[in-house]
Amino acid sequence: LMGIIMPEEPAGPVVKAADGAARITTFKTLTKDGHNPTLVPAITAGTLFTGVFSINISSTLKSTKFGLPYNKKPSKFSFTYKYTPGSPVYQSVEKDGRNHAVLVDDKDLDQCSIAAYLFEVSSYDETLDGTNVNTSSKVILKAELTDGTAKSDYQEVTVDFKETGNGSYDATKKYKLAIVCTSSKWGDQFMGADLSSLYVKYLAVE
């Protein structure tokens, strides 16, 4: 991949771990000379999600098409996970036509994010993506992990869906549900730590 150095283990951003969990990993992806062409971020957060991945060369964050059709009002989001954050935290910054990994001074450790979103659509062809899933007025319900810090042992968590203030559920309307799990919660800003690893064993919405 354009001379980018990738660690041998783990082998990719989302792989099956030895215990059967999904291992989701952030990479500092740089060429041998320490910077990348502008189309290749210097920091890439691993993301496991419901939806479709379709490469968008002009906007990497729009490659993740979040959401699947969902026909009822969700109440709870349950998951089992553990997390090993990397350090230090870097951000991919463009300079002189290249992307560089720049140290983020005010963040010592990375954090993960696990969240579920119910959003309204006029057509099931509509999706949200990495640029707008956390800001879109279409999202009416959201359930999320509140503590994205290190967890050495698996945690069983159940969180409630809460209204976002963008309207209430209406059974006559169309909705899609997006579950998004990432090893770097600031990944939509191309920010994270090399080899931060989120392990997810179980996901359920009820």
Which residue ranges define each predicted feature?
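Short amphipathic, basic-aromatic surface patches that mediate peripheral association
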Residues: 81-105
